[in-house]
Regions:
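Catalytic cores of TIM-barrel enzymes
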Residues: 1-165
Length: 165
């Protein structure tokens, strides 16, 4: 783990802010509304979420203060729900924990997904199959892998950074 003291301080500050927001009356009310919604009880209103993933590059960089690449990736993950909650006031819940990512790999039919960037906001998936009969030999078994060591390393890093918060 190569995170500077300044970046560590920033991540700890975000962890404290996340805890504060997660235990706020508004977040607790939202949790109850989501539970009612999920149980198919009549919600008082529609639940609204803004999916920040599609435009986070326009919002999050201005909020980021970490300088190291590894720290910036963690900071970005922490900022997503905080930004939804504070900037857009949508119905996104702020979690009371830092979730370690799933360290999974999936290769459908044994063919790695190929993406071609367009230079703009979109991308194109490059197909392997053009004629199913002719290209059937390309299809193999799908591959699923779990990187337990990677997940454990990320968990240890998170515990080291803000496990006491």
């Amino acid at each position: 783990m190569n995170i500077s003291q300044e970046d560590r301080a920033r991540l700890r500050e975000l962890a404290r802010q996340q805890q504060e927001l997660a235990h706020s009356p508004r977040n607790e009310r939202l949790m109850q509304e989501w539970i009612a919604y999920g149980a198919s009880r009549q919600p008082a209103r529609p639940m609204i979420r803004i999916e920040i993933d599609t435009f986070e590059q326009d919002v999050l960089p201005a909020l980021q203060r970490c300088t190291g690449e590894e720290a910036r990736a963690i900071e970005r993950r922490m900022l997503r729900p905080i930004a939804n909650f504070t900037l857009f006031a949508d119905d996104t819940l702020v979690p009371d924990h830092y979730a370690v990512r799933e360290h999974l790999q999936f290769v459908p039919f044994g063919l790695p997904v190929r993406r071609q960037e367009t230079g703009g906001v979109g991308h194109h998936f490059v197909p392997y199959l053009h004629d199913l009969e002719e290209d059937m030999h390309l299809l193999g078994p799908s591959v699923y892998r779990v990187d337990e060591a990677g997940a454990q390393a990320e968990q240890a890093q998170a515990e080291d950074l803000f496990g006491d918060i």
